[in-house]
Amino acid sequence: LQMCQGQNYDMKSSQALFPKHCNEAHDELSRYIKKCRDEQTKRAFREVYENLAEKANLTSKKLQIVCPKQTDDLITEGQALHHCVGTYIERVAAKKCLIVFVRRVEEPEKPFVTVEVSNGKIVQIRGERNSDPTKEVKKFVDLWSRKVLPMALQAA
């Protein structure tokens, strides 16, 4: 009943209160709500990075910072690196954190290192299987967080 109310069903309607096939009606409404939430989350996720993406990128001779373009990018990153960044989609969509990727310049599509930013600060830098970054990667991310991130966040 709460799901029906949330979707603005007529709560005086016998069809809403007493559907012929209650379980099927429940499952159908659940799928619809999940689809709507998924679409809203994907849209909110894309909006987070629309203004940020161009301003947040940084490239050196060996490394680059890139922003994800869609929610599937976080899932792919987590699967490839065997860590949990794929579970951060809703946090990013709710603007509780940002996720950016560190890539090797010669392999820009291959997941390498993932960075979490919260409240304008680096919270995590993780490689494959939650490994710590190399000194080179840490130095690059530190440079990015000092020189690029503050301006990117202001513009976003």
Segment roles from a protein language model:
Residues L1-A156:
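Catalytic-core elements of nucleic-acid end-processing and repair enzymes
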